[in-house]
């Protein structure tokens, strides 16, 4: 059973999966595959691959960052809910908001949350650039993003949402260090400071991951984020 494989992997990190959590992951997988037939949620559909490359990969940041506390998390561009929904299953006290620009994905997430009986979750159909200018600006303890865009771009989308004293947890593949070097200027301009870098391998040689923890030291200047599309077209880079 694939969920038992996940339980064994997590046990190595002193994390015990309850029966309820096991059932939630099984339901998550079933709904992901069902909905993926009518909309593009993921290219990964093999059961074991989903448990490894989506579920385990989403939970792995908790080996290095304490999510087991009552904090508010915003997940930018989470797609089918990664990493925040697996983290919510593991740590039910988290208050989770997902922002995604595609309404179909929001519909899936609403159905998923209902079926998993998740409390304190909200899903918002918006561009991160406009969301970061609104009432939720600088209101979250933690913002997560998983390989949505280059780190210089992600920083402009995510750092404005974090309250001073909070953290940006950026999850990248093995080329993350190059992106970090390029993004240092943007991170500084936006009020952040890189405090931790973690590199780890997924089980079964499924690839290397890098995780950056960026502390929000100062308020983000009001002009950021710039209008939709601009961060991607012209990232904040040192001239």
Curated annotation (Swiss-Prot):
Residues annotated to bind S-adenosyl-L-methionine: 77, 82, 128-129, 146
Main location: cytoplasm
Location(s), subcellular: Cytoplasm
CDD domains: AdoMet_MTases
Presence of the UniProt keyword Methyltransferase in the record: yes
Region of interest: Disordered: 214-239
Cross-referenced InterPro entries: rRNA_ssu_MeTfrase_G, SAM-dependent_MTases_sf
Superkingdom field: Bacteria
Statement: the UniProt record of this protein carries the keyword Glycoprotein: no
GO molecular function, one term: rRNA (guanine-N7-)-methyltransferase activity
Function: Specifically methylates the N7 position of guanine in position 535 of 16S rRNA.
Xref: PANTHER family: S-ADENOSYL-L-METHIONINE-DEPENDENT METHYLTRANSFERASES SUPERFAMILY PROTEIN
NCBIfam families, A to Z: rsmG_gidB (TIGR00138)
Name under which the protein is recorded: Ribosomal RNA small subunit methyltransferase G
Recorded name of the encoding gene: rsmG
